[in-house]
Amino acid sequence: MNSNQHILDELYQVILSRKGASPDSSYTASLLHKGVDKILKKVGEEATEVVIAGKGGTDTELIYETADLLYHGLVLLAARDIPADAVWSELQRRFGTSGIVEKAARKE
């Protein structure tokens, strides 16, 4: 098992610990203090940067921007009081299921 596999859980726990912190104490606390609309703006910006890096950027740029997108997605989950485990469970549920079959099941 790669020691990096738990980093998203660890990061999410740090994000949760910043929810009640002073906005001056960290970028995460500041973002959470500004609310969901500001976080959504950042998620949108980061998603756009992933697309740009994926289209014409280097591998390093794509990795960097994807990390930013994952981080801001976790901040959004924390702001909405959604446990990161809910996402991991959804990914597990989908694992091994054809994307076509899974998408068709959502339409029912």
Swiss-Prot record:
Bilayer-crossing regions: none
Pfam families listed in its UniProt record: PRA-PH (PF01503)
Protein name, UniProt field: Phosphoribosyl-ATP pyrophosphatase
GO molecular function, one term: phosphoribosyl-ATP diphosphatase activity
Pathway of action: Amino-acid biosynthesis; L-histidine biosynthesis; L-histidine from 5-phospho-alpha-D-ribose 1-diphosphate: step 2/9
Biological source species: Trichlorobacter lovleyi (strain ATCC BAA-1151 / DSM 17278 / SZ) (Geobacter lovleyi)
DNA-binding in keyword set: no
Catalysed transformations (reactions): 1-(5-phospho-beta-D-ribosyl)-ATP + H2O = 1-(5-phospho-beta-D-ribosyl)-5'-AMP + diphosphate + H(+)
A single BP term in Gene Ontology: L-histidine biosynthetic process
Localisation: Cytoplasm
Protein family per UniProt: Belongs to the PRA-PH family.
NCBIfam families reported for this sequence: histidine_hisI (TIGR03188), PRK00400.1-3 (NF001611), PRK00400.1-5 (NF001613)
GO cellular component, one term: cytoplasm
EC assignment: 3.6.1.31
Enzyme class: hydrolase
Keywords on record: Amino-acid biosynthesis, ATP-binding, Cytoplasm, Histidine biosynthesis, Hydrolase, Nucleotide-binding
